């Protein structure tokens, strides 16, 4: 019984976390396929887009650590 409750709470937490961290929580999961198709057509697209969207050193990065220009995050970009 306890394990079932823990599993239900965990699934609810992870579902909420997915929508909280999405760029646009109302359509966060809807826009995944068009981006994937664009990246399949041009494999270099994610690398090119990352340069424009990366955070400067000192910016807060705990929620989305992949956006640091230096790719090193410990509460802030280094």
From Swiss-Prot:
Residues 23-49 form a propeptide. Keywords: Cleavage on pair of basic residues, Disulfide bond, Hydroxylation, Ion channel impairing toxin, Knottin, Neurotoxin, Presynaptic neurotoxin, Secreted, Signal, Toxin, Voltage-gated sodium channel impairing toxin. GO terms for cellular component: extracellular region; host cell presynaptic membrane. Residues 1-22 form the signal peptide. Its main location: secreted. It holds the Pfam family Conotoxin. Expressed by the venom duct. Disulfide bonds join 54-69, 61-73, 68-77. The modification 4-hydroxyproline is found at residues 57, 65. The presence of a 'disulfide through disulfide knot' structurally defines this protein as a knottin. Delta-conotoxins bind to site 6 of voltage-gated sodium channels (Nav) and inhibit the inactivation process. Belongs to the conotoxin O1 superfamily. This is Delta-conotoxin BuVIA. It comes from Conus bullatus.
């Amino acid at each position: 019984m306890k394990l079932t409750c823990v599993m239900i709470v965990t699934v609810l937490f992870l579902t909420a976390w997915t929508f909280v961290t999405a760029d646009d929580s109302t359509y966060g999961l809807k826009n995944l396929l068009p981006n994937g198709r664009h990246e399949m057509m041009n494999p270099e697209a994610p690398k090119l887009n990352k340069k424009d969207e990366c955070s400067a050193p000192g910016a807060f990065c705990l929620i989305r650590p992949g956006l640091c220009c230096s790719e090193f995050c410990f509460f802030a970009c280094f």
